[in-house]
């Protein structure tokens, strides 16, 4: 990005604004609270407390145009091979809508719709049985997205199915889950793109044995034959996914089977509709008014121009407590790259470390560092305007904390006692959902997906591969025989010492 024509001008704006006080920016642009706000369907965004001004934003958008960001979105939605290292499209948007006239994307949408009908039919079959509990086994993109949505949108009581998620290869996770369930009233879903994932195969074997066979086992995989063979699952209970959808973008596909069981099929479709509506905003809105573009460019500004190494996400709605973990994978697996599309080294830092938690709990853990630490951490604060629980006073208190914390981080407070002085200057974006509905959550997740793509285009990297996860898995596979007491050639001296300790 530093080699773009407009970078020097952008850098000059950063030098000018790095030490600027956020109240001074607001005073210089009196209309800033509304001019830097956007409403897209059920989502409201306010960027007024970010440390840029109109001139800096114009320079950012100039580089976005130089990077052909609008064309990059067209290529994404039309099903061109934007995943160049694996020579694949990235058609997660086609799982939820048909927004272009491109045959590849339209065919993908039709295929996904057919599979979704199969999901609905399987749910109807399960509703006619005595099954009350579902154990969903997957990891990474096969777990984090479904787990987030099911937890966020499940009814407080009265759901037809209780869905339990197991991901970790640690047997304690499966043991604790199964200890509360009756195998005669439980079904299992095994989700793995390749059906070669160690965690899913090991946990799937435990579940298969506990259930007493495969009669109530289902699978979702891009390798359906392997899935059916591994656990003797009838082909009619194996749902496909495709290599043109990455795992972390796959909750909209049959990977969402446990979501539909947890919240109901109709509400699952509403989730997809919400995402598709936000997709339409991204595809059809000029860059300057495009919220996903502004969110992504803000992340680039904070990372590359202001030097922020981390980014925090705080969800002021307990039902969204799993969102930071989901975003960690979406953002860091997509953008944790050190080479560009052509294999050359990047010319600027890429992804920040994303982390966070649920408010107000986090105010009593890491907010001390946000307010008075030496690192400036940009943040997203996410809340809901309306809440449907019966405790209205609690919701008022929750939203008061959103307003108070963002103001305190931005403005700070002087004190004659340096220990009680708040420097301020901490930027944040506030995102408010009208209410936590399936449509709103779908739109929110879509926004973050597209923000990630914006950043990848600006940095010239591939957001859709993840080769960095492979080496550790390969080494773990090679070390398994040694841990079982078999002879193995282990070259690394530290690993040899640790093996000796583990083997006693």
UniProtKB/Swiss-Prot annotation:
This is Glucose-6-phosphate isomerase. Its EC number is 5.3.1.9. HAMAP family: G6P_isomerase. It catalyses: alpha-D-glucose 6-phosphate = beta-D-fructose 6-phosphate. Gene3D superfamilies: 1.10.1390.10, Glucose-6-phosphate isomerase like protein, domain 1 (3.40.50.10490). The keyword Isomerase applies. One of its GO terms (cellular component) is cytosol. One of its GO terms (biological process) is gluconeogenesis. Catalyzes the reversible isomerization of glucose-6-phosphate to fructose-6-phosphate. Belongs to the GPI family. CDD domains: SIS_PGI_1 (cd05015), SIS_PGI_2 (cd05016). It is an enzyme of class 5 (isomerase). Its main location: cytoplasm. Keywords: Cytoplasm, Gluconeogenesis, Glycolysis, Isomerase. Coiled coil: none annotated. Pathway: Carbohydrate biosynthesis; gluconeogenesis; Carbohydrate degradation; glycolysis; D-glyceraldehyde 3-phosphate and glycerone phosphate from D-glucose: step 2/4. SUPFAM superfamilies: SIS domain. The active site is at 333 (proton donor), 364, 473. One of its GO terms (molecular function) is glucose-6-phosphate isomerase activity. It is found in: Cytoplasm.
């Amino acid at each position: 990005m530093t080699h773009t024509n407009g970078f020097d001008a952008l850098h000059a704006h950063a030098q000018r604004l790095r030490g600027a006080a956020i109240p001074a920016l607001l005073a210089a642009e009196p209309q800033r609270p509304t001019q830097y706000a956007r409403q897209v369907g059920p989502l409201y965004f306010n960027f007024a407390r970010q440390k840029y001004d109109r001139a800096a934003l114009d320079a950012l958008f100039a580089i976005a145009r130089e990077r052909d960001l609008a064309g990059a979105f067209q290529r994404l939605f039309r099903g061109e091979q934007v995943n160049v290292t694996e020579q694949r499209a990235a058609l997660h948007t086609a799982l939820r809508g048909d927004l272009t006239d491109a045959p590849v994307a339209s065919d993908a949408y039709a295929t996904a719709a057919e599979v979704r009908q199969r999901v609905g039919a399987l749910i109807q079959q399960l509703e006619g049985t005595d099954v009350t509990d579902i154990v969903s086994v997957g990891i990474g993109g096969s777990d984090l997205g479904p787990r987030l949505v099911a937890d966020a949108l499940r009814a407080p009581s009265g759901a037809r199915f209780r869905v339990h998620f197991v991901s970790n290869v640690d047997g304690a996770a499966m043991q604790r889950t199964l200890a509360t369930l009756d195998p005669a009233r439980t079904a299992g879903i095994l989700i793995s793109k390749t059906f070669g994932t160690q965690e899913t195969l090991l946990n799937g074997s435990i579940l298969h044995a506990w259930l007493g066979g495969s009669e109530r086992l289902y699978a979702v995989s891009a390798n359906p034959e392997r899935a059916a063979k591994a656990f003797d699952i009838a082909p009619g209970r194996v749902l496909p996914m495709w290599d043109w959808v990455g795992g972390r973008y796959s909750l909209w596909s049959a990977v969402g089977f446990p979501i539909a069981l947890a919240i109901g099929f109709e509400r699952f479709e509403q989730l997809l509709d919400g995402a598709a509506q936000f997709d339409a905003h991204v595809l059809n809105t000029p860059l300057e008014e495009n919220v996903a573009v502004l969110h992504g460019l803000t992340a680039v500004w904070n990372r590359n121009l202001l030097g922020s190494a981390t980014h925090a996400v705080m969800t002021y709605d307990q039902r969204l407590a799993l969102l930071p973990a989901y975003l960690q994978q979406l953002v860091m697996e997509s953008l944790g790259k050190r080479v560009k599309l052509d294999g050359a080294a990047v010319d600027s830092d890429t992804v920040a470390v994303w982390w966070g938690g649920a408010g107000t709990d986090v105010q009593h853990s890491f907010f001390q560092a946000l307010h008075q630490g030496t690192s400036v951490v940009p943040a997203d604060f996410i809340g809901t305007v309306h809440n449907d629980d019966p405790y209205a006073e609690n919701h008022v208190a929750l939203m008061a904390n959103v307003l108070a914390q963002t103001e305190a981080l931005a403005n700070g407070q002087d004190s004659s006692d340096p220990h009680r002085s708040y420097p301020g200057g901490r930027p944040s974006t506030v995102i408010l959902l009208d209410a936590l509905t399936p449509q709103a959550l779908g739109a929110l997740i879509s926004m973050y997906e597209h923000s990630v793509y914006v950043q990848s285009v600006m940095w010239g990297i591939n957001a859709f591969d993840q080769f960095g996860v492979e080496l550790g898995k390969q080494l773990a596979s090679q070390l398994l025989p040694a841990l079982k007491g078999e002879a193995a050639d282990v070259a690394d001296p530290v690993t040899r010492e640790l093996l000796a300790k583990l083997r006693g």
